[in-house]
């Protein structure tokens, strides 16, 4: 099938676009998924759908609270965080009977709403009495990438006077550079860690407290109670750090699926609670469609099938390029969401694609050369708004023309001229167009990718909701740290031992 020219598939089927595109309505806006510039055909799609015919039960099981995270014996209920009935109740519409899990979600959303109101009114003050208006999120992985990406993507909706910063790296430079930009008297720090024992997060929180002590001249307990908020499921551990304001996390929500919860507190404070709710509503709309539609009408399944097809035909990576400055960090968010979810042992042998990417049109002047003429097989995914959030029509037209030119150029190539001037074409692209970047459409796109990841995991026989690979590096890092601090005397490979020796020489 890979020998078939994509452009010939268009020539032989006038209805190809209709058959291989899906449109998802999100309130007044929409998202358009175009899989037609791939090698997919209806026959290929139907072949995969036949293998997925029992996935409906698995999908219902997730929404119903079955323990589909089988390695940890946990429910997978990030969908409950944006449950339609929960959101209706938060807005004061009706009083549905919620199950225990969704009742906890509702209670926490109301708690977030109240805190945002206190923040807006100036009732959240620091040790000097100044209103806190600078939000600093301290977390790593899912406690950082999701909120960081959303705050960046929704910059157009950010509220005047509210600033957001993110600290994740254990390299102290990350924290120090943030402190160089902020007024510590007006800064609120949100420490996000489910266990509240994540090394990078806790050490960064401790460094932030130490720097605040120096700058504000107050003791740590007062600083912690006034300038810090925790998001965690381990209240006892939070208490050891004198942080009194605690928001909940639950075992049924994994970090990379958690931005819809109090993990997204930085989002709610930055864009306001109403816009945070709009984000959740967009995701909720996709949840409804995903659960209701099966087979060819399920956009997430078709998206998964495209990736499965190329994975089984020798592709090992996917390049995501967003032609939208606001979406610059989207591929980084998906990098974790996809690779941590499906980059593990598989019953079928295959695992998820390597995810990388960048920002259009910048990337056209960096790595697109390889995409057009390189020997590596790359599945390219392009995202683009149909309406911009600015009034400069000329510039948006240039963005659109570049995005469409790349997808067409990768497909048709150029056969004339010398070998150096020739482009073989027949390179697949998936194009995702959204009518306009709003909280709803962003939420809908994130939910779409979450569900696509789930479908891929089901097909490969992977539990997409645990992350055992994270623990090995942590264990070895602890051993090396003990050696550095003269608390251990382990034998290492010659390479590691030599680098440790060099480190010792530099410290003398």
From Swiss-Prot:
It comes from the Eukaryota. In the cytoplasm, catalyzes the conversion of glucose-6-phosphate to fructose-6-phosphate, the second step in glycolysis, and the reverse reaction during gluconeogenesis. This is Probable glucose-6-phosphate isomerase. It is an enzyme of class 5 (isomerase). It is found in: Cytoplasm, Cytosol. One of its GO terms (molecular function) is glucose-6-phosphate isomerase activity. Belongs to the GPI family. D-glucose 6-phosphate binds at residues 142-143, 193-198, 336, 340, 365, 474. GO terms for cellular component: cytosol. It catalyses: alpha-D-glucose 6-phosphate = beta-D-fructose 6-phosphate. Homodimer. The active site is at residues 340, 365, 474. Keywords: Cytoplasm, Gluconeogenesis, Glycolysis, Isomerase. InterPro entries: G6P_Isomerase (IPR001672), G6P_Isomerase_C (IPR023096), Phosphoglucose_isomerase_CS (IPR018189), SIS_dom_sf (IPR046348), SIS_PGI_1 (IPR035476), SIS_PGI_2 (IPR035482). Its EC number is 5.3.1.9. Pathway: Carbohydrate degradation; glycolysis; D-glyceraldehyde 3-phosphate and glycerone phosphate from D-glucose: step 2/4.
């Amino acid at each position: 099938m890979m020998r078939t020219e994509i452009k010939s598939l268009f020539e032989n089927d006038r209805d190809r676009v209709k058959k291989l595109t899906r449109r998802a309505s999100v309130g007044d806006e929409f998202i358009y998924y175009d899989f037609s510039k791939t090698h997919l055909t209806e026959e290929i799609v139907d072949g995969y759908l036949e293998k997925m015919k029992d996935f409906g039960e698995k999908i219902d099981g997730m929404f119903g609270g079955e323990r589909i995270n089988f390695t940890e014996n946990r429910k997978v209920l990030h969908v409950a965080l944006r449950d339609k009935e929960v959101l209706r109740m938060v807005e004061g519409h009706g009083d549905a009977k919620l199950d225990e899990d969704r009742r906890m979600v509702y209670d926490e959303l109301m708690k977030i709403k109240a805190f945002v109101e206190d923040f807006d009114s100036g009732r959240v003050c620091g040790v000097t009495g100044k209103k806190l208006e600078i939000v600093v999120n301290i977390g790593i992985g899912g406690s950082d990438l999701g909120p960081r990406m959303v705050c960046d993507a929704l910059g157009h909706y950010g509220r005047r006077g509210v600033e957001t910063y993110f600290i994740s790296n254990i390299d102290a430079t990350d924290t120090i550079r943030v402190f160089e930009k902020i007024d510590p008297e007006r800064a609120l720090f949100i420490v996000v860690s489910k266990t509240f024992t994540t090394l990078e997060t806790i050490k960064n929180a401790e460094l932030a407290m130490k720097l605040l002590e120096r700058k504000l001249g107050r003791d740590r307990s007062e600083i912690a109670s006034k300038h810090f908020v925790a998001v965690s499921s381990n209240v006892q551990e939070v208490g050891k750090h004198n942080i009194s304001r605690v928001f909940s996390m639950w075992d049924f929500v994994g970090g990379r699926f958690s931005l819809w919860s109090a993990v997204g507190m930085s989002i709610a404070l930055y864009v306001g609670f109403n816009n945070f709710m709009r984000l959740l509503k967009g995701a909720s709309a996709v949840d409804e469609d995903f659960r209701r539609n099966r087979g060819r009408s399920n956009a997430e399944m078709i998206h998964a099938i495209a990736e499965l097809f190329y994975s089984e035909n020798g592709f090992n990576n996917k390049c995501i390029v967003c032609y939208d400055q606001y979406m610059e960090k989207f591929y980084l968010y998906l990098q974790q969401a996809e690779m941590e979810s499906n980059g593990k042992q598989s019953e079928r042998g295959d695992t998820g694609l390597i995810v990388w990417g960048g920002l259009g049109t910048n990337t056209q002047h960096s790595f697109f050369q390889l995409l057009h003429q390189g020997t590596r097989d790359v599945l390219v995914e392009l995202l683009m708004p149909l309406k911009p959030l600015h009034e400069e029509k000329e510039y948006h037209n240039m963005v659109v023309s570049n995005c469409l030119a790349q997808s067409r150029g990768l497909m048709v190539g150029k056969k004339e001229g010398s070998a150096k001037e020739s482009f073989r074409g027949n390179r697949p692209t998936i194009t995702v167009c959204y009518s306009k970047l709003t909280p709803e459409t962003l939420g809908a796109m994130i939910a779409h990718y979450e569900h696509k990841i789930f479908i891929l995991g089901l097909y490969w026989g992977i539990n997409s909701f645990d992350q055992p690979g994270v623990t090995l590096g942590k264990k070895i890092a602890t051993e090396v740290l003990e050696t550095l601090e003269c608390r251990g005397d382990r034998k290492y490979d010659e390479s590691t031992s030599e680098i440790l020796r060099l480190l010792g020489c530099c410290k003398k």
